[in-house]
Design a protein with these regions (language model features):
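Alpha/beta-hydrolase-fold catalytic nucleophile elbow
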Residues: 79, 117-118
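Glycine-rich phosphate-binding loop signature in dinucleotide/nucleotide-binding domains
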Residues: 19, 70-71, 109, 146, ...
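Charged, glycine-enriched surface loops/patches
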Residues: 95-117, 134-150
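Short secondary-structure boundary/capping segments
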Residues: 16-17, 38-40, 106, 167-168, ...
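Conserved SGNH/GDSL esterase-like catalytic core that processes O-acyl groups on lipids
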Residues: 2-100, 123-133
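Conserved beta-strand termini and adjacent loop/short-helix elements that scaffold enzyme active sites
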Residues: 50, 117, 153-156
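Catalytic His-Asp segment of secreted/periplasmic serine-dependent ester chemistry enzymes
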Residues: 124-204
Length: 204
């Protein structure tokens, strides 16, 4: 995990630059890190962006105490998993990492709302789309079975066209990362989840 060290050290300094004690943690890979409008989009919920480039779900577990553990969040939203699959991990392995991350959250923060954003479709990783879909189905089923304050945010379906192929306007020209229009969509979908599930965290 040493290759993440520079990014992790950068995130360790974020807390000192915030004018508030964060209540909503966004944690995960570059899809979180590159969400440039995140603080503006969800500012009333006192967010902190703890995304780091190339992060896997396994890395999110590894660095959880070091990064998320320095805060006292009232809710956590996670996006990770596609890099695990891109590295050759099997869907079942990714689901195990998800369970481990849930355990980290529960052990440290109790039964706070924890949401997992589905792995997005991408043109670059279309060759592993079956694994992406299967991983999403495994994690969605896991969340449904556990219930409670565990939630699944489905962005996958909204990012595909009628044929099931990724909609290009939601992706950068590299076919992998999210475009500004894509983040507008994420703001809408994630915002709907927040409004219906954890709206009481809005700053008074």
């Amino acid at each position: 995990m040493n290759w993440y060290e520079n990014e992790v050290q950068r995130l360790e300094k974020v807390k000192g630059n915030l004018p508030y004690d964060p209540k909503m943690v966004f944690y995960g890979s570059s899809s979180i890190r590159l969400w440039d409008s995140l603080y503006e989009d969800f500012g009333t919920y006192k967010p902190v962006n703890l995304g780091f480039g190339g992060s896997t779900l396994a890395a999110c577990v590894w660095f959880f105490d070091r990064l998320v553990g320095m805060y006292h969040p009232e809710s956590i939203i996670v996006y990770a998993g596609d890099n695990d699959l891109g590295d050759g991990r099997h869907p079942e392995e990714v689901c195990i990492f998800f369970r481990q991350l849930v355990a980290c959250v529960r052990d440290r923060f109790g039964d706070i709302p924890l949401a997992y954003i589905s792995i997005k479709p991408s043109i670059t990783r279309w060759s592993i789309v079956d694994n992406i879909r299967f991983t999403n189905s495994l994690i969605s089923a896991e969340i449904e079975a556990k219930g409670g304050n565990l939630h699944y945010i489905n962005v996958y379906d909204r990012m595909t066209d009628q044929t099931g192929y990724p909609r290009r306007e939601f992706l950068d020209p590299d076919g992998l990362h999210i475009s500004p229009k894509g983040y507008d969509l994420w703001k809408e979908v994630v915002g709907q989840y927040i409004a219906t599930s954890i709206h009481d965290q809005r700053i008074s």
